[in-house]
Regions:
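Phosphate-group recognition and catalysis centered on beta-loop-alpha active-site segments
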Residues: 1-245
Length: 245
C-alpha cells in the first residue's frame, strides 16, 4: 500500500507549506500532492486557492478582508502575508513556498511530487518553466490531468512522465488513457462515495466494488482524499495501489 499526502498535510500543519511538506517527507509518504500557481511576476508558488483569503493572514493574525488573487500579486507582495497562523502560533512566520523550495527539500528522495492544477491552467512557456525547474533537481514528479490534451501536453515535454488520471473512468475512456500511458506510469483516481464529495456527479468516479475492479483492469487504482480513520479502513477494503490522506 502506498500513501499520498494531500497538499502536504491539511490536518495538523498549514496546507501547502514547507512545515507540511517537511513533515510528509519525514513520515515517509510515497507521494506529496501540491498545487502550483503563478504570481504576477511569474514565480511558481504553491497554493490550492486562487485567492489568498482562506489560508493567509496579515502578520498580526487578522483576516485579509479584500479578495486578492495570487496572480495579481508579485512574489514580494505575497510574502507580506503569513501562511502559518491559520494553524496557530506554532507556525507563525511561515510563508507561501515556491515549487523550487519543495523540489529542493525532496531532492534525492524517493518521494514523488504530484503536480495538480498547473497542467490544466497553463501552456506554452509557463508550462515549459515548470518542466525546466523539475529537470534541475533529482526529484520524481507526476502530473495530475483530466483530459487527453493534458496528457499530450505533458508527454510532449516528458514522454515517460508519471500520470495521475483524475477524469472520466468509463471503460472506453480508460482504454484510451492506457493506450497513451504505460501501466506502470499511470494511476487512476476514484473518490469515496461520501457527503464531502457530493459535488462529484459522475457515479463511475466513486468507489464501489465494480468501479474499482474496472479501473484495475487498466491502471493502478488510487483513492483520493480519504479524510477519517473509518474511511481509511473502508478504502483498504478496495485494495488500491495508493490512498491519499
Amino acid at each position: 500500500m502506498h500513501f499520498r499526502s494531500h497538499r502536504g498535510g491539511v490536518y495538523y500543519t498549514p496546507e501547502n507549506t514547507m512545515p507540511a511538506f517537511r513533515d510528509a517527507l519525514a513520515q515517509g509518504f510515497d507521494v506529496i500532492e501540491t498545487d502550483p500557481t503563478l504570481t504576477k511576476d511569474g514565480v511558481i508558488v504553491l497554493s490550492h486557492d486562487a485567492t489568498v483569503n482562506r489560508c493567509l493572514r496579515h502578520p498580526d493574525g487578522s483576516l485579509i478582508e479584500e479578495q486578492q488573487r495570487i496572480r495579481d500579486l508579485t512574489y514580494e507582495e505575497l510574502m507580506a502575508y503569513d501562511a502559518g497562523l491559520i494553524k496557530g502560533e506554532a507556525f507563525r512566520g511561515t510563508k507561501v513556498p515556491t515549487l523550487e523550495e519543495l523540489f529542493s527539500a525532496a531532492d534525492g528522495t524517493d518521494t514523488v511530487i504530484c503536480i495538480d492544477k498547473y497542467v490544466k491552467w497553463y501552456d506554452g512557456e509557463k508550462l515549459d518553466a515548470l518542466f525546466a525547474l523539475a529537470n534541475r533537481y533529482n526529484v520524481k514528479v507526476s502530473y495530475l490531468v483530466e483530459t487527453f490534451e493534458q496528457i499530450e501536453k505533458v508527454q510532449l515535454r516528458d514522454p515517460d512522465a508519471l500520470i495521475d488520471w483524475d477524469g472520466l473512468s468509463d471503460e472506453e475512456t480508460l482504454k484510451a488513457v492506457c493506450a497513451k500511458v504505460k501501466y506502470e506510469n499511470l494511476v487512476v483516481w476514484l473518490y469515496m462515495d461520501k457527503p464531502n464529495f457530493a459535488w462529484l456527479k459522475e457515479p463511475l468516479r466513486k468507489t464501489s466494488k465494480e468501479n474499482c475492479a474496472r479501473v484495475k483492469q487498466y491502471a493502478r487504482l488510487g483513492i483520493s482524499n480519504v479524510s477519517n480513520p473509518s474511511d481509511v479502513k473502508e478504502a483498504f477494503d478496495f485494495e488500491p495501489y495508493i490512498i491519499e490522506v
